[in-house]
Amino acid sequence: LVGSEMCIRDRYLGCLLGNYGETVMLAYGGGYIKRNGVYDEIMGILNASGKRVVEFDRIMSNPTYAKAQEGAKLARENHVDLILAVGGGSVSDCCKVISAQAKLDEDIWELENTKHTFPTEFIPLGTIVTVFGTGSEMNNGAVITHEEKKIKGALWGAQADFAFLDPSYTLSVPMKQIISGAFDTLSHAMETYFGKPDENNLSDDISEAVMRSVIRNTRVLLTDPENYDARSE
């Protein structure tokens, strides 16, 4: 986990890329990262590192199982060596499943939900966080919508080898997304806070600190959206 201003530009990403093979799948959502310059910056680093880039875009909020299967097929066909997920929790979740499914000969949904076994091989995954909220970059859980089965549920895929959190990448996130991310973070903290065991005081203390920080810094951002310190918190 690398978190600081300029952490991507200061050659950290380029250095890490040398640990992986030639082909990188660059996965992202809509055109947001192209409008704010993040796409050009990352592509420049990938090209300077001599990587062959396969793009996988239009990952939607609340990613679908069909979209993950589409990505897995693309990864297999192109012999992808690293998946680089750029975005928020939805992009990360989709890529966790892609990473696992691309290495499987069977359907990951049936594997986990019917056979109750879990994948053990993955395409390496890295994340660049541009939208705060879920903390998806820190675990291997993914929330996926299976449209055919009309189920929204959890799958367990890859955990990222590395994650970059540069607060400056969030400076162009609109106010609606700031508020959404704040409430998303609060809801996750409350899950732990109100969950069992009730006597786990350390977890409760951490959750309270997270909630206080989110409330305090969101109030700052409501009046000063480009406040770097509040974004970094």
Regions picked out by a protein language model, each given a short descriptive name:
Residues 21-24, 122-124:
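Residues that mark the start of a beta-strand
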Residues 24-29, 54-57, 83-86:
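Short glycine-rich or small-residue beta-strand-to-loop segments that form or flank ligand, phosphate
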Residues 42-57, 74, 78:
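Active-site cofactor/substrate anionic-group-binding motifs, chiefly glycine-
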Residues 141-233:
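Carboxylate- and glycine-rich phosphate/diphosphate-binding segment that chelates Mg2+/Mn2+
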